[in-house]
Swiss-Prot record:
Organism, scientific name: Lymantria dispar multicapsid nuclear polyhedrosis virus
Keyword presence, Cell membrane: no
Function of the molecule: Required for late and very late gene expression. Specifically required for expression from the vp39 and polh promoters.
Keywords attached to this entry: Transcription, Transcription regulation
Pfam families, A to Z: Baculo_LEF-2
Gene, per the UniProt record: LEF-2
Gene Ontology BP term (one): viral transcription
Disordered: region residues: 67-88
Keyword Transcription regulation attributed: yes
Name assigned to this protein: Late expression factor 2
Protein family (similarity comment): Belongs to the baculoviridae LEF-2 family.
Biased composition (Low complexity): 71-82
Amino acid sequence: MTSSSCPRASLNYRPAMKASDVDPDAEYAVPLEHFDVEVSPYTVFERGGTCVRVSGRRLACLLRNGSRGESAPAPAAAAASAGQPGRKRSCKNVCFKGATSRRELERTLTARVNLPPCMTGLLRQFEIRNRGDRYRKRFVFNCYLINTTTCTACDRRCFVNAAAVLYERDEKCVREMMSLLRREDCYKPPNCSKMSQESLCFKSGACRGTNPLCNF
């Protein structure tokens, strides 16, 4: 499920909040990057998939136990990193906030990025199943996505929603994307030769260069 059906609106979580500031009887919309929150099929996403709905009692417990995301950047640091030369300037600006299905996600992506056949092939395989001999394929696609696209509107928070849509809100798959997003320098996908050895590349005349990143 992608949004709450509860009529009561969630309160906004503030990074400066302490456990004593939390109303235990309220519900809060908490950005995923602020806490190491376990995502499950029952997790309620809000704000276009950038936040999860958390009860006040659980939020107070998270604050008391120091369960904040270790790699979550401060707002000022995030804004500064967005303007660093070479980090995002060469990426295509894409926002996945409105994507609610795999087809919508793919249309949003391909409208801005010229996907090489190997990445299109991975998308087709994810339609069949997300898990079961798919970890390496998810890793390669996630790395490609992070290295070729960015979102200046929400500093890539919508990428968590993209992973939730693409991988059918599978907890493990979504956390893999979150882990890569927290890295200062994300891994790059393997070169075309390595992709071919792993049966991830089927060589097309439409490709250029020696790495999938050359084709966007």
